[in-house]
C-alpha cells in the first residue's frame, strides 16, 4: 500500500521516494530514473534546436533542455503533435519555462506545473491507499497556557494527550493523580516522552484536529525554544510545515498526517466547528468544553487539574474516534482520484476533479489545458447566468434528468423470463429481460410519444440518439464502444454489432407452457441422480400367526441434503406432495450436517423408478436444475459452475453432459487422479466455464435455491467479456442502416446492473437516469465542434454540443456512475460486513467526485474550465423546470402559486429488507438520484418506516425516497425531558393527540390525531405520540435460550469480562450480591445442566461468581463491548425475537433497575452512566412494546466525596403494567415490590387502547442550524417516528385555476398527477395532498392558506419569537383571519389602523407591549448592545446575577436617545410614571408584522397606520381585490 511519495536530490538529480506499507512492514522504495518534463507546441518543428539552446540559471547552475522528442497527443479531442522537453531536475522547470514560452516559435507550453511526485503517480499508474494493509493510527492533542495578548507559542504546553486502539493517555509535568496520566518533570521532558511514544508505537497515521494550523506549529516552536529535536518522520526528519492557500499544512514523512478539520469542514455543515460541536454532530454525544481561561486558572492554582486532564484525554480520544470514522472515506477518495491521502484530505472538490481528470487525460493521451493566468482568472470570475427563476422562486438547477428520447418503437422484441419473446411495450417493471449479464431486472419502463425519423439497423429500429454497443478489434485489443444510432448512417462507426443467435431459442424455452407435472418430474429425477437412493430390500421374518417364515418386500426413496439448504428442502417436500400426495419423513443424524428425506411406499418407489428409467427423455432444463442444485456448485474463485463425481459415478457425468449438449450449453469434462489407501481413485469433473456458458445455464436452467442463483449472477458479472466470437451465446455481426418515418409510442428500459439488453436479438443500450452533462454530451471538446452530424443545442444560450462521439468529461462521468452502480450491486450481494462497509465507502466516494463535476465547469481555476458548458447545464435545468411548470399551467389550466417542502432531521425507525434499524435520517440519504430545484432526492429500495395508521395501529409502510435541502427557516428543539428532544423546522408538523372532552366519545381516532406546528404546542394540543406496542417478531422460545439471554442481561448490568489475563479467556464475572442463591437457582444451574456454561465458582464472599464458559467469554467481548471497552448493546439484538429481548431486559433490570414509589406513583427505572447503552435499552423497550422516556441528573455523581465526572442517566418506564406482564424482574424482592406498587394503579390513559403512548413537551426553543434538513416519503400515512415521536411528512406545491370552482380544481389536479408522474424520474411522484379554499403568497417562503375545515396554515409569516410583543402577534393573527376566513382585505387594513390608533392614544394595556429576549452568552462577550443586553448589564451592575439563558422582559419608553437607554424591565413599569413609546411599537412591532402580508395586495406602510387627516395613500388605490 502506497502511503505517499516525494523526491529528494542526490548528486543534482531527483530521486523519487515511495513510502509504502507491505506485509505489515513500512518501507521506502527509490526510483532514480524518472525525469521531469513539459510539453511545447511549436509553430515550426525546425525551431526545436533553438528551444534546446535556451538557458536559465538556478542557484548558480545553468538550466537547459537535456533532450526532446516529438509525440502525438490529443487536445480537447483533436489530434495534435507536441514536443516533450526533458530536464535534469524538477526545479529546472519553473526556472526556464517562461523563457521557453516567450520564444517566438513557441505557441504555448503545457503540463509545466504538475508537481514531480504527483506526476510520477500519474505516469506510473500507481494508486495510493490500494491494498488491504491494516494501518496503525494514533491521535494526539495538546493543552497550552494562554493569557490574553500573548504571542503564539509564548506560553508552555501543559499536556500532550494521545489515543489509539489501546486507549487514551495524558502526559503532563504537574502532579495529577489519575490512572491515565503520566507525570514527567518538565515541559521539555514531556515533549521528549511524546516523541518516544510515537517512535515506539510507530503509527502509520497521525490524527489531529486542526493540527495543520495549531498543534504541530506550537509543538515545533516550543521544541526549538527548549532545544528538542522534533523528529517525527520515519526518515528521521522533522514535520514540514508549508502554506496551502490561506492555511498551513503539515507533512510527516513516512506517516500520513490526517488533519480532520479541513475534511469535516468540507463534509458536514455546522454552525460551529469546535471539536465538541463536531463530536456531538457525528456521534450524538455531548463533550465537555474547558475554556482557555479555565485551563490557565487550574494550572496556576492547582485546583481543577483533574478536570483539565480528563478534558485533554477526551480530546485525544474523540479525535481518534472521529479519525476512525472519516478515514475510510478519504482513503477511498485517494484511491479514486489517484493522489495521496495527505493531498486529497486537504483538497477542494474542484481540485479532486482536476486530479482525477489529469490522471484520466494521461491514460487517454489527452494533453491537459493550462491553469488560467491572473488576467484570465479575473475574466472567468465574471460569472454566468444562474438557474431558472419562477417568481418568487429562486434556485440553481443542476444535473436534472432530461427526458431525452432514446428509445425503440412498440413492436421491438425482447425476451422476458417466463413470457418468452414479447413486444417491448408489454414489458412491466419487475420483469426480468435477457441482457448482457443474463436475466436482468427491469427497474423502469419509459414510454413517450414520438414523431420523426427512426434508424433501422439490421432490423432493430431506434430513435437517432439511441446507443448501441459496437465491438472494434485491433491488433492490440478488443474495445466495446457505445455509438449513436444516427452514426450508423455514416461511415464513422467501425466495428460490429453484438448479437445472440439464441434469441429465438431462449424465447421459445421461456414461452413453452410446460406442465408443472413435467417440471417436477424432471427436477425430481435430477435430484435423485445427484443426492438420492432407491432402495428395495427383502427381509425374511417369522409370521407367528401363521406359523411360518415370510418375506417382507421393503421399498424406500431417500434424498440427503445439507441442513442449511432450506430452499432445496422446501422444494423436495413440495415435489413429493404434488406428484405423489405424500410428505416425506425427515431424519437428521447426530453430529452431522445432513438431513435425509424418506418415503417408504411401494407405489411411490415404483413411480420414481419409472421416472428415473426415462430420465433422458424428461424436460431437460428441469432435470439439470435438480441435479445441479444437488451436486453442483458455483466456484467463486474460478467463476464457474462445477460438478464432481467419484470413481464409480462417471455414468452420471455422461447423463448430464448429454442433456447439456441437447440444450447447447458449452461445458468441459476432465478427471483428477489421486491415491487413497494405496489405491488410485478418480474424480470426474464437469465444468461450465466462460461467460457464454454461464449465461446460457442461467437463462435456460438455473438453480432452485436463491443463494446459488445469486452466486451464479455474481460469477457472470465478474466474468470479463473477453471472447465475443465463436462462442455459444454471443456473435458479432456486420450491419446495414437506413431510415424510416414513424409516429407513435417509443419505449426504453432501465435495468439493474450492466446497462445493455437484447432487442430483436441485437444488444442495445438501456436508458439511464442521465445527468444533463452525460445526456447532452456537455464537454469542452464537444462544444461547437465543427463537422458534426448531430448537435444538442442548449436552450436560451445557444451553445451546441457534438453528439457524434462521447466527450472527455461526459464519458468519464458516465464511467463513474456505471462504476458506482456496480459497486452498489456488489455491496448488496455481499454478506461480509467488512467488505460491505468498504464498498459503501467506495460508492460514497464516487458519489462525492461525480457530484463535483458540474461545479467544476464553473470553477474559475479549473484547467477544463468552460463557461459555455456551465451556462448550458444551467439552461437545460431551467428548461426542465419551466416545462414542468408550464405543462401544469397550459395543459391543465393551473396557475402555480408556490412550490416548496417542509423537512426534519433526526433518527428514524425503519425496516430495511426485513431487518429493523434505528438510523439517522441523513444516513438514509446515500446519493443524489434526482434534483428538483433546491431539493435533492435519494431513491430507496427495500426500506419501510414504522408509522401509525388511522386506527391507531403501528404498521410498516414503504419509503420510496428520502429528500433533503438547505433551509433558512427557523429550527425548533422540542424537549420532552432534559435528555430527549426532537429538532424540527418551524413549519414541520408533529402529530398531536387531542386528549380532551371536546372530542365526543366513539368518534374515530383520526379526529383526535391532529397536525400541530412546534409553536402551537401547549395550546389545544398538549400531548404527542410515542410507540407502545411490540414490533419485534415472536417465536416459540427455547427455555434454555431464555435463561441465556437473562444471564447476558445480568452480565451487562452487573458483570465484567474481557482483558488480557488468562482468566478473561475462559471466565466472565457476575456480581450477584444478596441475590446470589436466587440467581444460581433460576439462571446459572439450568444453564450448567444444559451445558451452556461449564460451571461457576465463588469469587468472593460478597456474592461475586466466576462463570466458566470460553465461548461466552468470547461472545461478550466480541459483541457487548465497544472499541473503547465500554459496555454496549449490539445492533443485531434489534432483530432478535421478542421473547429473547424481554429475557435480556429482565436480566438487565434485575441487575441495574429499581422499583419505587415517588409521590405515590410507581416508578421503574434503569440507571447507568453510559448514554449509548441507555439509548439502546430504550430501543429494545420500544421493540417489545414498552413506552419509556429518558432523563439525566444535572448534578454529577460523586465518589469518595469527589465528583466522578459522570452523570446518572435514567431510562424510565411509562407502560409499567406491560413491563410487569412481559419483562418484570428475576429477583423476588423486586418482583414483590413491583406488584405491591402497581396493585392500586391502572393504565388510565385513553391512548393505551391503541398502539401508542403520550408524551408531553416540556420546553420549546429555537436553535442555530445551518445544515441540510431531511424528510422521507411514507406511503399511505405520511407519518413516521422521529426520535420516538410521531411526525408528519410532506413535500408539495400549491396551484390553482383562476375562476374555477373547488370541484373543478380538485378534478384537474388529479388529472395532472396522472399525466406528470410517468414523466418524473425514478420513484419520484407528485401526490394530491389537500385542497385549500383560499390563500396568498408573498414570497417563495412566505405564504398563508386556509383549508376546507377552516384551519389556517402559514409559513414564513409567523412571529412567534420572544422579541415580538403580544400586540404585534395579536394584530397579525386578526389580519390573517380577515383575509383568509372572510376574504376581506379591507377589513384587515381597518384592523391595523385601529390598533395603530389605540397605540397612538395609549389605549393598549402595557402587558401587551412586553418584549422577551434571552441572554445567550456571557455579557462580556456581547459586542453589540441591544435593549435586553443593556438592561442585563444594568442589572448585573446592581449585583443581580445574569447568566446565559436568562430571559429579559422589557418595555420601551417614550423619550429620546438610544432604544437601549429607554428600556426598563416590565416589573419596574409604572403606568403613573412611565409612558411607552407608541411610535416604536407602531414602526418596529405592529407594522412589520402585517406589512409583509398586506404588501401582497398592493398596500404600503403609509397606507396602514392611523392618520388624523385620513389621507389615503396611492398604494390603497392600487390594491388588488378580494381573493
UniProtKB/Swiss-Prot annotation:
<dbReference type="InterPro" id="IPR027434">
    <property type="entry name" value="Homing_endonucl"/>
</dbReference>
<keyword id="KW-0677">Repeat</keyword>
<keyword id="KW-0404">Intron homing</keyword>
<dbReference type="InterPro" id="IPR006142">
    <property type="entry name" value="INTEIN"/>
</dbReference>
<keyword id="KW-0651">Protein splicing</keyword>
<feature type="domain" description="DOD-type homing endonuclease 1">
    <location>
        <begin position="524"/>
        <end position="665"/>
    </location>
</feature>
<keyword id="KW-0068">Autocatalytic cleavage</keyword>
<dbReference type="InterPro" id="IPR036844">
    <property type="entry name" value="Hint_dom_sf"/>
</dbReference>
<dbReference type="GO" id="GO:0016539">
    <property type="term" value="P:intein-mediated protein splicing"/>
</dbReference>
<feature type="domain" description="DOD-type homing endonuclease 2">
    <location>
        <begin position="1047"/>
        <end position="1186"/>
    </location>
</feature>
<dbReference type="GO" id="GO:0006261">
    <property type="term" value="P:DNA-templated DNA replication"/>
</dbReference>
<keyword id="KW-0378">Hydrolase</keyword>
<dbReference type="InterPro" id="IPR023211">
    <property type="entry name" value="DNA_pol_palm_dom_sf"/>
</dbReference>
<dbReference type="InterPro" id="IPR012337">
    <property type="entry name" value="RNaseH-like_sf"/>
</dbReference>
<dbReference type="InterPro" id="IPR042087">
    <property type="entry name" value="DNA_pol_B_thumb"/>
</dbReference>
<dbReference type="GO" id="GO:0006314">
    <property type="term" value="P:intron homing"/>
</dbReference>
<dbReference type="InterPro" id="IPR050240">
    <property type="entry name" value="DNA_pol_type-B"/>
</dbReference>
<dbReference type="InterPro" id="IPR030934">
    <property type="entry name" value="Intein_C"/>
</dbReference>
<dbReference type="InterPro" id="IPR004042">
    <property type="entry name" value="Intein_endonuc_central"/>
</dbReference>
<dbReference type="InterPro" id="IPR003586">
    <property type="entry name" value="Hint_dom_C"/>
</dbReference>
<keyword id="KW-0808">Transferase</keyword>
<keyword id="KW-0235">DNA replication</keyword>
<dbReference type="InterPro" id="IPR006172">
    <property type="entry name" value="DNA-dir_DNA_pol_B"/>
</dbReference>
<protein>
    <recommendedName>
        <fullName>DNA polymerase</fullName>
        <ecNumber>2.7.7.7</ecNumber>
        <ecNumber>3.1.11.-</ecNumber>
    </recommendedName>
</protein>
<keyword id="KW-0464">Manganese</keyword>
<dbReference type="Pfam" id="PF14890">
    <property type="entry name" value="Intein_splicing"/>
</dbReference>
<comment type="similarity">
    <text>Belongs to the DNA polymerase type-B family.</text>
</comment>
<dbReference type="GO" id="GO:0003887">
    <property type="term" value="F:DNA-directed DNA polymerase activity"/>
</dbReference>
<dbReference type="Pfam" id="PF00136">
    <property type="entry name" value="DNA_pol_B"/>
</dbReference>
<keyword id="KW-0540">Nuclease</keyword>
<dbReference type="InterPro" id="IPR006133">
    <property type="entry name" value="DNA-dir_DNA_pol_B_exonuc"/>
</dbReference>
<dbReference type="InterPro" id="IPR006141">
    <property type="entry name" value="Intein_N"/>
</dbReference>
<dbReference type="GO" id="GO:0003677">
    <property type="term" value="F:DNA binding"/>
</dbReference>
<keyword id="KW-0239">DNA-directed DNA polymerase</keyword>
<dbReference type="InterPro" id="IPR004860">
    <property type="entry name" value="LAGLIDADG_dom"/>
</dbReference>
<dbReference type="Pfam" id="PF14528">
    <property type="entry name" value="LAGLIDADG_3"/>
</dbReference>
<dbReference type="GO" id="GO:0000166">
    <property type="term" value="F:nucleotide binding"/>
</dbReference>
<dbReference type="InterPro" id="IPR006134">
    <property type="entry name" value="DNA-dir_DNA_pol_B_multi_dom"/>
</dbReference>
<keyword id="KW-0548">Nucleotidyltransferase</keyword>
<dbReference type="InterPro" id="IPR043502">
    <property type="entry name" value="DNA/RNA_pol_sf"/>
</dbReference>
<comment type="function">
    <text>Spliced protein is a DNA polymerase used in PCR reactions.</text>
</comment>
<dbReference type="InterPro" id="IPR003587">
    <property type="entry name" value="Hint_dom_N"/>
</dbReference>
Amino acid at each position: 500500500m502506497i502511503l505517499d511519495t516525494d523526491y529528494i536530490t542526490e548528486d543534482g538529480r531527483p530521486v523519487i521516494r515511495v513510502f509504502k506499507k507491505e506485509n505489515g512492514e513500512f518501507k521506502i522504495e527509490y526510483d532514480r530514473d524518472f525525469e521531469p518534463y513539459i510539453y511545447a507546441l511549436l509553430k515550426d518543428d525546425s525551431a526545436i534546436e533553438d528551444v534546446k539552446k535556451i538557458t536559465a540559471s538556478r542557484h548558480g547552475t545553468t538550466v537547459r533542455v537535456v533532450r526532446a522528442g516529438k509525440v502525438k497527443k490529443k487536445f480537447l479531442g483533436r489530434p495534435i503533435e507536441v514536443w516533450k522537453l526533458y530536464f535534469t531536475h524538477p526545479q529546472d522547470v519553473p526556472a526556464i519555462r517562461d523563457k521557453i514560452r516567450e520564444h517566438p516559435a513557441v505557441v504555448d507550453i503545457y503540463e509545466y506545473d504538475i508537481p514531480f511526485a504527483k506526476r510520477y503517480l500519474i505516469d506510473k499508474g500507481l494508486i495510493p491507499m490500494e491494498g488491504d494493509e491494516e494501518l496503525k493510527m494514533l491521535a494526539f492533542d495538546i493543552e497550552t497556557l494562554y493569557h490574553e495578548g500573548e504571542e503564539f507559542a509564548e506560553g508552555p504546553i501543559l499536556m500532550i494527550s494521545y489515543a489509539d486502539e489501546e486507549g487514551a493517555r495524558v502526559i503532563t509535568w504537574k502532579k495529577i493523580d489519575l490512572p491515565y496520566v503520566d507525570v514527567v518533570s518538565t515541559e521539555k521532558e514531556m515533549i521528549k516522552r511524546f516523541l518516544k511514544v510515537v517512535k515506539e508505537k510507530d503509527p502509520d497515521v497521525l490524527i489531529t484536529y486542526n493540527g495543520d494550523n495549531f498543534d504541530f506549529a506550537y509543538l515545533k516552536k516550543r521544541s526549538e525554544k527548549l532545544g528538542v529535536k522534533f523528529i517525527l518522520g520515519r526518515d528521521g526528519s522533522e514535520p514540514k510545515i508549508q502554506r496551502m492557500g490561506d492555511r498551513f499544512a503539515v507533512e510527516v514523512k513516512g506517516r500520513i498526517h490526517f488533519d480532520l478539520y479541513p475534511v469535516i469542514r468540507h463534509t458536514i455543515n455546522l454552525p460551529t466547528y469546535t471539536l465538541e460541536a463536531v463530536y456531538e454532530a457525528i456521534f450524538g454525544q455531548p463533550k465537555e468544553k474547558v475554556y482557555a481561561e479555565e485551563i490557565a486558572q487550574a494550572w496556576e492554582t492547582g485546583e481543577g487539574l483533574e478536570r483539565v486532564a480528563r478534558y485533554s484525554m477526551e480530546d485525544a480520544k474523540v479525535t481518534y474516534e472521529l479519525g476512525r470514522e472519516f478515514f475510510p472515506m478519504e482513503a477511498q477518495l485517494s484511491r479514486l482520484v489517484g493522489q495521496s491521502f495527505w493531498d486529497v484530505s486537504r483538497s477542494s472538490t474542484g481540485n479532486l476533479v482536476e486530479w482525477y481528470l489529469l490522471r484520466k487525460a494521461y491514460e487517454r493521451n489527452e494533453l491537459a489545458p493550462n491553469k488560467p493566468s491572473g488576467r484570465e482568472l479575473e475574466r472567468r470570475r465574471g460569472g454566468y447566468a444562474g438557474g431558472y427563476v419562477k417568481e418568487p422562486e429562486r434556485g440553481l438547477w443542476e444535473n436534472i434528468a432530461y427526458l431525452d428520447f432514446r428509445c425503440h418503437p412498440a413492436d421491438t422484441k425482447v425476451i422476458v423470463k417466463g413470457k418468452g419473446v414479447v413486444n417491448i411495450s408489454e414489458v412491466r417493471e419487475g420483469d426480468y429481460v435477457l441482457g448482457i449479464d443474463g436475466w436482468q431486472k427491469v427497474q423502469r419502463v419509459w414510454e413517450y410519444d414520438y414523431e420523426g425519423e427512426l434508424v433501422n439497423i439490421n432490423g432493430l429500429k431506434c430513435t437517432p440518439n439511441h446507443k448501441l454497443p459496437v465491438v472494434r478489434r485491433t491488433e492490440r485489443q478488443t474495445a466495446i464502444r457505445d455509438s449513436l444510432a444516427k452514426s450508423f448512417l455514416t461511415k464513422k462507426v467501425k466495428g460490429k454489432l453484438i448479437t445472440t443467435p439464441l434469441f429465438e431459442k431462449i424465447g421459445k424455452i421461456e414461452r413453452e407452457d410446460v406442465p408443472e407435472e413435467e417440471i417436477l418430474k424432471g427436477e425430481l429425477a435430477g435430484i435423485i441422480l445427484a443426492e438420492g437412493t432407491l432402495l428395495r430390500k427383502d427381509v425374511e421374518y417369522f409370521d407367528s400367526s401363521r406359523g411360518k417364515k415370510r418375506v417382507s418386500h421393503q421399498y424406500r426413496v431417500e434424498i440427503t441434503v445439507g441442513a442449511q439448504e432450506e430452499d432445496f428442502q422446501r422444494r423436495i417436500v413440495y415435489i413429493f406432495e404434488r406428484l405423489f400426495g405424500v410428505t416425506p419423513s425427515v431424519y437428521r443424524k447426530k453430529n452431522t450436517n445432513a438431513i435425509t428425506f424418506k418415503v417408504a411406499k411401494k407405489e411411490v418407489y415404483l413411480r420414481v423408478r419409472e421416472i428415473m428409467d426415462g430420465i433422458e427423455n424428461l424436460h431437460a432444463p428441469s432435470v439439470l436444475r435438480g441435479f445441479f442444485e444437488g451436486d453442483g456448485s458455483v466456484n467463486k474463485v474460478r467463476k464457474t459452475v462445477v460438478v464432481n463425481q467419484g470413481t464409480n459415478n462417471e455414468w452420471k457425468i455422461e447423463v448430464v453432459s448429454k442433456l447439456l449438449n441437447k440444450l447447447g450449453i458449452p461445458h468441459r469434462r476432465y478427471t483428477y487422479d489421486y491415491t487413497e489407501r494405496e489405491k488410485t481413485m478418480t474424480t470426474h469433473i464437469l465444468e461450465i466455464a466462460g461467460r457464454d456458458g454461464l449465461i446460457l445455464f442461467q437463462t435456460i436452467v438455473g438453480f432452485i435455491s436463491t443463494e446459488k442463483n445469486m452466486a451464479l449472477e455474481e460469477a457472470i458479472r465478474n466474468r470479463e467479456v473477453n471472447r465475443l466470437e465463436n462462442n455459444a451465446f454471443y456473435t458479432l455481426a456486420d450491419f446495414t442502416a437506413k431510415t424510416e418515418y414513424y409516429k407513435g409510442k417509443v419505449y426504453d428500459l432501465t435495468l439493474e446492473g450492466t446497462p445493455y439488453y437484447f432487442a430483436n436479438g441485437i444488444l442495445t443500450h438501456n436508458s439511464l437516469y442521465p445527468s444533463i452533462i452525460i445526456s447532452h454530451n456537455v464537454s469542452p471538446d464537444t462544444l461547437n465542434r465543427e463537422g458534426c452530424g448531430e448537435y444538442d443545442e442548449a436552450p436560451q444560450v445557444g451553445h451546441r454540443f457534438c453528439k457524434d462521439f462521447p466527450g472527455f468529461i461526459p464519458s468519464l462521468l458516465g464511467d463513474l456512475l456505471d462504476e458506482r452502480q456496480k459497486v452498489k450491486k456488489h455491496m448488496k450481494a455481499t454478506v461480509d460486513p467488512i467488505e460491505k462497509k468498504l464498498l459503501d465507502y467506495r460508492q460514497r466516494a464516487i458519489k462525492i467526485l461525480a457530484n463535483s463535476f458540474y461545479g467544476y465547469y464553473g470553477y474559475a481555476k479549473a484547467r477544463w474550465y468552460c463557461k459555455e458548458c456551465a451556462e448550458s447545464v444551467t439552461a437545460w435545468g431551467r428548461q426542465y423546470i419551466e416545462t414542468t411548470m408550464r405543462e401544469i399551467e397550459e395543459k391543465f389550466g393551473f396557475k402555480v402559486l408556490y412550490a416548496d417542502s417542509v423537512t426534519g432531521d433526526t433518527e428514524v425507525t425503519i425496516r430495511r429488507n426485513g431487518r429493523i434499524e434505528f438510523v439517522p435520517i441523513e444516513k438514509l440519504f446515500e446519493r443524489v438520484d434526482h434534483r428538483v430545484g433546491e431539493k435533492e432526492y435519494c431513491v430507496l429500495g427495500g426500506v419501510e418506516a414504522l408509522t401509525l395508521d388511522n386506527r391507531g395501529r403501528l404498521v410498516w409502510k414503504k419509503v420510496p425516497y428520502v429528500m433533503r435541502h438547505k433551509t433558512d427557516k427557523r429550527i425548533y428543539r422540542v424537549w420532552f425531558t432534559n435528555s430527549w428532544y426532537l429538532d424540527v423546522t418551524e413549519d414541520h408538523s408533529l402529530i398531536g393527540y387531542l386528549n380532551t372532552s371536546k372530542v365526543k366519545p366513539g368518534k374515530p381516532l383520526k379526529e383526535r390525531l391532529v397536525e400541530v406546528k412546534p409553536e402551537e404546542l401547549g395550546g389545544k394540543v398538549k400531548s404527542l405520540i410515542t410507540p407502545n406496542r411490540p414490533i419485534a417478531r415472536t417465536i416459540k422460545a427455547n427455555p434454555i435460550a431464555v435463561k441465556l439471554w437473562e444471564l447476558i442481561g445480568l452480565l451487562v448490568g452487573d458483570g465484567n469480562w474481557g482483558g488480557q489475563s488468562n482468566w478473561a479467556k475462559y471466565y466472565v464475572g457476575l456480581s450477584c450480591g444478596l441475590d446470589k442463591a436466587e440467581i444460581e437457582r433460576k439462571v446459572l444451574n439450568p444453564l450448567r445442566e444444559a451445558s451452556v456454561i461449564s460451571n461457576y465458582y465463588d469469587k468472593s464472599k460478597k456474592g461475586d461468581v466466576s462463570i466458566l464458559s470460553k465461548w461466552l467469554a468470547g461472545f461478550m467481548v466480541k459483541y457487548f463491548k465497544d472499541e473503547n471497552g465500554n459496555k454496549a448493546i449490539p445492533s443485531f439484538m434489534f432483530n432478535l425475537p421478542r421473547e429473547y429481548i424481554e429475557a435480556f431486559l429482565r436480566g438487565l433490570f434485575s441487575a441495574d433497575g429499581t422499583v419505587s414509589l415517588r409521590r405515590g406513583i410507581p416508578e421503574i427505572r434503569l440507571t447507568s452512566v453510559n448514554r449509548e447503552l441507555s439509548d439502546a435499552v430504550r430501543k429494545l423497550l420500544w421493540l417489545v412494546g414498552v413506552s419509556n422516556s429518558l432523563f439525566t441528573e444535572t448534578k454529577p455523581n460523586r465518589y469518595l466525596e469527589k465528583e466522578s465526572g459522570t452523570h446518572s442517566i435514567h431510562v424510565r418506564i411509562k407502560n409499567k403494567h406491560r413491563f410487569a406482564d412481559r419483562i418484570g424482574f428475576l429477583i423476588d424482592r423486586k418482583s414483590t415490590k413491583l406488584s405491591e406498587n402497581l396493585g392500586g394503579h391502572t393504565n388510565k390513559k385513553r391512548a393505551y387502547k391503541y398502539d401508542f403512548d403520550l408524551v408531553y413537551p416540556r420546553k420549546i426553543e429555537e436553535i442555530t442550524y445551518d445544515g441540510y434538513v431531511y424528510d422521507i416519503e411514507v406511503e399511505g400515512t405520511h407519518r413516521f417516528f422521529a426520535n420516538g415521536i410521531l411526525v408528519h411528512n410532506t413535500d408539495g406545491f400549491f396551484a390553482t385555476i383562476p375562476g374555477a370552482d373547488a370541484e373543478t380544481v380538485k378534478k384537474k389536479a388529479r388529472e395532472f398527477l396522472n399525466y406528470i408522474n410517468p414523466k418524473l424520474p425514478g420513484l419520484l411522484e407528485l401526490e394530491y395532498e389537500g385542497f385549500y379554499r383560499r390563500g396568498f403568497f408573498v414570497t417563495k417562503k412566505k405564504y398563508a392558506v386556509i383549508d376546507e375545515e377552516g384551519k389556517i396554515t402559514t409559513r414564513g409569516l409567523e412571529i412567534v419569537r420572544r422579541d415580538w410583543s403580544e400586540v404585534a402577534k395579536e394584530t397579525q393573527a386578526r389580519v390573517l383571519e380577515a383575509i383568509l376566513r372572510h376574504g376581506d382585505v379591507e377589513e384587515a387594513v381597518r384592523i391595523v389602523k385601529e390598533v395603530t390608533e389605540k397605540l397612538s392614544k395609549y389605549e393598549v394595556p402595557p402587558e401587551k407591549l412586553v418584549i422577551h429576549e434571552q441572554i445567550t452568552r456571557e455579557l462580556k462577550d456581547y459586542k453589540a448592545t441591544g435593549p435586553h443586553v443593556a438592561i442585563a448589564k444594568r442589572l448585573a451592575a446592581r449585583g443581580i446575577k445574569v447568566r446565559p439563558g436568562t430571559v429579559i422582559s422589557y418595555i420601551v419608553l417614550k423619550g429620546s436617545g438610544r432604544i437601549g437607554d429607554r428600556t426598563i424591565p416590565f416589573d419596574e413599569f409604572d403606568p403613573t410614571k412611565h409612558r411607552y413609546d407608541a411610535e416604536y411599537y407602531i414602526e418596529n412591532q405592529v407594522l412589520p408584522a402585517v406589512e409583509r402580508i398586506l404588501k401582497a395586495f398592493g398596500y404600503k406602510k403609509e397606507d396602514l397606520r392611523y392618520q388624523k387627516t385620513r389621507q389615503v395613500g396611492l398604494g390603497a388605490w392600487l390594491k388588488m381585490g378580494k381573493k
